[in-house]
A protein has these predicted regions:
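Acidic (Asp/Glu-rich) sequence patches and key acidic residues
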Residues: 1-223
Length: 223
């Protein structure tokens, strides 16, 4: 639950990637946002979500396993309080993120070219900052498609964004503070067996690297 920004796109002129990355780095340094560069050879197999159909009755998404030999470059940003922002590109210029599958052998990846970043617990200013970085990508020739749950990308309305975030925060805190009461409303008599977990609202989870990769460096040059 929470406000997210969804984005996909392609960089037609890949000669502009270096300048684009440096421009994003400059903003991250200005704001104090953690970031790292990526320049990796991705070889093996990947699982990727594929759109089958054109939105009609037979439309569906399916995971497919495919061979992959790609060069993955760009910058990965960690806006405080938000999920990871991948501004990274494959050899064909598409925005894409690769993650090593934690339960598989080396050389198997989860790939995603339909990207999103959750900003609910980062607040309006960091949400706006992420939109600023995406606009920066457009300045360097990235053709973007963006959907913003907070509508800031489309409207530039900070007050509307802050209001939507506040409403969702209130709902989340209600769910966290009165789980037994809510369980009783939903489950009735069965609520007595409802287990309440001790969770930290707003905590950002970082996916651990698989055991075989934890001694690697951040990136590796293409062979």
């Amino acid at each position: 639950m929470g406000i997210c920004i969804y984005y996909q796109g392609v960089l037609r002129d890949r000669n502009r990637l270096f300048d684009l990355t440096m421009a994003v780095r400059a903003k991250c340094r200005e704001w104090g946002w953690p970031h790292r560069f990526v320049n990796e050879r991705i070889v093996g197999t990947m699982e990727i979500l594929v759109d089958h159909g054109s939105g009609g009755e037979d439309w569906k998404w399916e995971w497919e396993t495919r061979p992959v030999d790609d060069r993955w470059r760009g910058i990965v940003v960690n806006p405080p309080g938000c999920e990871t922002l991948y501004l990274t590109f494959g050899r064909d210029g598409r925005l894409i993120a690769y993650k090593s599958a934690p339960d598989r052998q080396p050389g198997h990846y989860i790939a995603n070219d339909l990207l999103y970043v959750k900003t609910q617990f980062g607040g309006p200013e960091r949400h706006i900052g992420i939109c600023t970085l995406l606009r920066l990508l457009e300045e360097y020739g990235v053709e973007l498609e963006v959907h913003d749950d907070g509508r800031y990308w489309e409207t530039g309305d900070r007050e509307q964004l802050a209001h939507q975030m506040e409403i969702i925060n209130n709902i989340i805190h209600l769910l966290a503070q009165e789980p037994q009461r809510l369980a009783a409303l939903v489950l009735g008599e069965d609520a007595g067996d409802f287990e309440v977990l001790d969770v930290e609202v707003g905590k950002v989870f970082r996916e651990p690297k698989p055991e075989w990769r934890r001694e690697w460096g951040i990136s590796a040059e293409e062979n």
